[in-house]
Amino acid sequence: MGQPAKVLQLFKTLHRTRQQVFKNDKRALEAARVKINEEFKKHKNETSPEKIKEMMKLGSDVELLLRTAVIQGIHTDHDTLQLVPRKDLLTENVPYCDAPTQKQ
């Protein structure tokens, strides 16, 4: 896959992730859309392969961070926030063990 195709794929992936992470939050969806588009437009004339690779890494890191670390919260009262976790954020809650057992 050529570099322009990889850039386009990252662009689309970021937008898909944005839609999942900020689902039902019009303001956040719009802000993320504007920021993604702005950053890609700002660097659209970049020709240096090293610089493009560096920006692709940054974009991939941002996508991973959005997907794994951002959680929505809804104000239900003036001092109450209801968290809305996505299924991919929920992991098995394994209790901590001070004395691990040795494998036989």
Curated annotation (Swiss-Prot):
GO cellular component, one term: mitochondrial membrane
One of the GO biological process terms: cellular respiration
Compartments where located: Mitochondrion matrix
Main location per the UniProt record: mitochondrion
Keywords, in A-Z order: Chaperone, Mitochondrion, Phosphoprotein
Modified residues (Phosphoserine): 60
Record note on quaternary structure: Interacts with UQCRFS1.
Function (record text): Assembly factor required for Rieske Fe-S protein UQCRFS1 incorporation into the cytochrome b-c1 (CIII) complex. Functions as a chaperone, binding to this subunit within the mitochondrial matrix and stabilizing it prior to its translocation and insertion into the late CIII dimeric intermediate within the mitochondrial inner membrane.
PANTHER family hit by this protein: COMPLEX III ASSEMBLY FACTOR LYRM7
Protein name, per record: Complex III assembly factor LYRM7
Lineage, top ranks: Eukaryota, Metazoa, Chordata, Craniata, Vertebrata
Gene: Lyrm7
